[in-house]
Every structure is written in C-alpha cells, then in structure tokens.
Amino acid sequence: CLHPLVHLPAVKLRRHVEMYQWVETEESSEYTEDGQVKKETKYSYNTEWRSEIVNSRNFDREIGHKNPSAMAVESFTATAPFVQIGRFFLSAGLIDKIDNFKALSLAKLEDPHVDIIRRGDFFYHSENPKYPEVGDVRVSFSYAGLSSDDPDLGPAHVVTVIARQRGDQLIPFSTKS
C-alpha cells in the first residue's frame, strides 16, 4: 500500500518522496597573480527539497551541512496487475505506456498520523512544514489512467491504444519500417 488513505481506480499510482537537504554549489573563477593563472573555488550551501539523497560526505565543508544517509520512505509507482479495455486485457508493454500522470489533490484527506501534517498537496513529516529542517520528508501522489468517473478526480481518462489482438489480450503493434 502506498498510503493507507490513498486509493483510487487508476492504472498507476505514484508516491513521490522528497527530503529537505543541504545542497552544495561550487563556483570557480580564474585570475592572474604574478603572471600565473590561478583558480579560486568558492562553495555555498543552501537547503532544498530533493527526491534523491544528497551525499554530504563529499562536501568541501561537511561540518554543519550533514544530510541523512537514507530516506525513511522511498518513491514508488504501483501498477494495477490487470487492466482491461472492454473485454480485452492490456499487455505489460501497453500498460507501461500509460504515463500521463496528474497530481492528486490531498485536500479531502485527513492527516493520517499524529506525526504527519497535510499542507496543500503534500503530507509532511516535519515539526513545521513552513520552516522545514534538514531531514524532514514530504510526500505527494499522482495517478495515470483513471479507469472510472470520480466525483473528485473527474471523468475517466481516455486512452488511445494501437495494438494487436492475441486471444483476450491486446499487445503492442509495430509496423515493419
């Protein structure tokens, strides 16, 4: 389960996880001193939401800019094991092509846990989402291939499939070029 409160009739549901982390920016410049070209490198540090772990061990100044080494929860995409159009099942190759993801509004969901705060379309694991600290995590969701009309999400998504029939399955069709 991607999240106990998030379930919907869609082909795919994606959980996108970001962590607030230190990021190092390197700026180099060359100058001439006593007839020799020298290079000066300046490092600056700021914090950003990132979906990948930023390894702070390689920073020029790691002290005071240390990031966690792992995320408590990972990004993940769940895909329905069986997808039908009419009486035909889509092959895995066709299901893979359904990737027009739309952001899922979390407005009508409750905060799932005392340690989790919902702000906008994110769940935050943070003391205060307005003022995040390094190591705080936020999670958003998106979906693709809405399979039926939904009062909150709108009409079912229209998917155009060019395929070949094999029994009760639709499989990718390719022309000889």
Short names for language-model regions:
Residues H7-S177:
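Charged, low-complexity helical/coil segments in non-catalytic cytosolic or luminal regions
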